[in-house]
Amino acid sequence: MCRFVIYKGTSPVQLCHLLTRPCHSIINQAFDSRLRLDRRRPINGDGFGVGWYDCTYDQELGSQPCIFTSVTPAWNNVNLTRLAEKIKSPLIFAHVRATTAGTLSLDNCHPFQFGKLMFMHNGGIAEFPKIKRRLQSYLPDDLFNMVNGNTGRSIQLRKLPNAYAKTFTPDQLRQAMVETIAEINVMTEEAGITEPSLLNFCVTDGESVVATRYISSRTDEAASLWFSSGTTFNEFAEGGHYKMSKMDKRENIILIASEPLTFEKADWMEIRTNHMVVVTPKMNLLQIPIIDKYYVPPSDPASMNRTTSFAAGKGLLSPRREITAETENCPAISI
């Protein structure tokens, strides 16, 4: 039942406007999820992480992202609160974790960094231990030696482009995610695994962003994923009530999140199951289908009849698709 949020903007934003100040910030989602309900792990308290790129390039510092992780609950980490008030970035990844695979350790806290690239994921590979050994045997030495955790991130690394290249294209990152998903499907099928895998992957090079919403099933919904875009994202009422404003046709800000950060229904669009979102360096947002045997085109009535029970049972989707409020400060909204 992990959560993540991505910010990409033409101007840098303080981390606190994503992490701490909104009444439904990702930190609040760690203990007060409204969209995803998981009776097994109701709290995302198994660590957190935030990664960001510098506002301007510095030759001495390089182009790699900085990542801060901890195994403590995000809402109880005073250092995170302090950093969030003092750091600005035009591209931010943040993640709160509820462990489903692997131990409670820094090595398993998202996001992860490999050269210039940063990535994180949500969901899980079905019966991952059955393919873990085979997967690791495919890794080249440099990747094998850097993977210390055991959450399945090694399969993402395998298909990524050269992390030390100076530049990447959005299509390179998009293709890497397509190939990653295809390889997972081949491995699970050959291992006789029939349970679907829920694969929400995110990767960035600091310029482009790719995020997938995917499930290896033609009849089930994938884990939730939303996006919001506009010209400003700010607090419009006391108590951490934020909204996305659209002053013109420009996209100055793009947010991608497991669960909306605001209770403004008009702010958010749901990403279709078995699609990916690609954000280009020029802030163009593309929603692209992941076409394989599990893809159901929107023209097919079956695309409207995917069931929510599987993802809901994993705590990755609400069966009602409703955010409910239990306090006066956060009004209810159906999505």
Model-inferred region functions:
Residues 1-121, 125-335:
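Conserved short alpha-helical segments that host acidic/polar catalytic motifs at enzyme active sites
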